[in-house]
Amino acid sequence: MSSQLESEASFEATTLGFLRRQFTRPKPLPAGITLDGQVAIVTGSNVGLGLSVCKQLLQLGLSHLVMGVRSQAKGDVAADQLRKSFPSALISVWIVDMESYDSVCAFASHCESLDRIDIVILNAGLIKTPYTVAHATGNEVTLQVNYLSTALLTILLLPILKAKKAGGGSRPPVISIVGSDLMYQNEVELKGPVLPQFQQEETFSQFSWYGRSKLLQTLFVSKLAEFVDLNDVLVNVSNPGMTGGTDFFRGYPALVMKLIAVGQWILARPVNVAATTYLDAVLVQGEKSHGSFTSDWTIKPYPKLWYTPEGQELKERLWEETMEELNFVGASRIVNDLKS
């Protein structure tokens, strides 16, 4: 449905568009939603938005929660807190380090052991300063975590979800990749290779690169959806908006943190409110969200670049580069096999 919203794309890139999104009134979930018997996977789930959406899924009766975390110790602490509130639920803590392809592959392989998977929320992400390289891959970490490893995990999980889809008239499983409306304000060079642009340390800007990495996510998902039957698995991008009360900006200089805190005090959503956008993406929007960008409890347009011939060329070029980068797992074969 995002593909049909070109007329709204320019406005979303403006300051007024941002303000309208931030002050949109939250929409409650429809009555009667229950997740009894269902299994959900949430990455980046030991703090902030990830932990909040875990709690909300459990409040809806989720039977089995898999928390994908980088630190076993921190994950166990968060899981123990949840177990005290939801003693009847099974809560597992599995390691996934998004800076490592090997860790991502191991996590996906672990997911094959589950009897079913109904919901996947890929929430793990970062905004990093200074310029840092992921030692396991040699890629800049913003690109690695927010885009490449997230794309890899999505591709690896899709056939697993398709194979484990519940029978009968149940809704298809959903993968929602957490994006950002910062993509509306950031672009990449339209000519030449896309991924190498993130290896140019001299052009590094943490906020810009974060927004650009989220732009790549949305371009990728819009293309990926062409290979995935919406009756098998739904895949979308969900934007929580500016959110206060998280550790997202940890490690920044004190002055920067103070400025961010002021901005968040004025504009940001509470964590528990922002997390409901994830629930909306996986439980409410349904098939119209397939391949789309969800934000503020509705479907929003892609960035205006997407609707141009240049944007479509960029999408195709990014896709080819991504398939080449992930060729070590046979990404192209996996994606093409989804059609069968």
Residue ranges of model-derived segments:
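Short alpha-helical oligomerization interface
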Residues: 127-145
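Glycine-rich, N-terminal phosphate-binding loop of Rossmann-like dinucleotide-binding domains
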Residues: 44, 124, 146
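NAD(P)H-dependent oxidoreductase Rossmann-fold/reductase module
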Residues: 1-114, 118, 127, 186-340
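Redox-cofactor binding/interface segments in oxidoreductases and associated redox assembly factors
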Residues: 42, 122, 177
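Glycine-rich NAD(P)-binding loop of the Rossmann-fold in SDR/ketoreductase-type enzymes
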Residues: 141-149, 212-213, 269
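Amphipathic alpha-helical dimer-interface segment in Rossmann-like NAD(P)H-dependent oxidoreductases
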Residues: 145-169, 183-186, 225-226
